[in-house]
Amino acid sequence: MAKSLREWIDSEVRDIRAKSMRWLSQYHFFRDPTRPMWSDTSCFFAPADGIILYEKVVAPDDPIVEIKGKPYSLRDALRDESYDKPSLVIGIFMTFFDVHVNRIPFPGRLTYKMLEPIETYNRPMLDVEKTILEELRISMDDAAYLHANQRVVNRVESIQLGQAYYILQIADYDVDSVMPFNLKQHQPYAQGQRFSQIRYGSQVDLIVPLSPRYEFSLKHPPGLHVEAGVDSLIAISETRAQAFACEEVA
């Protein structure tokens, strides 16, 4: 279940924080715990374990966040100047202590594309992680990696919703660290199903275009820790117009 940052550190991090990096890398980081696959199409589940950094509805070219005065928009995130849909976006920061297996938030058929870093190397995420773990707060001042780093854009086409949504995986300093479990395109996935892993620190964003048929409501504030396939992030309900249309047909 979703926990405050303090609760998560006390229950999941404190006892292993003093372990060596070698021990953490060998015995802790690559764990893949068994989790139930909940089926609840009244919500989007979290695609990743981690801390909610930000969540908001934005126009395609409006800033999701500003990083030292430089805006970062949906078009920047997806690296697609033609993207034209106002969307609900939720950013989840995966610390070194999190499970790094990603899961499908809502059932659909997945295609993906890998986008190389803008610069020669990826930028590190360590400063953002230190602020979270040591100061128990979120600061985007050192989040230049959002503009620069290698990423995978996963597009999930949902028949039930009548639209696509996106899972954006952003790699940390190491390149080629996003590893899909199935390299084939256009594959069907169930809600909560494992689809990929990211090595070491990383970030996963859930991007849901707004819909004339459904209302999308946020369920948790920034700063909470969530688990992939366990915690619901967005509640889905029919819009009044859609509900009225269904009543008229009935």
At which residue positions do the language-model features occur?
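Contiguous, well-folded functional domains in the mature portion of proteins
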Residues: M1-A250
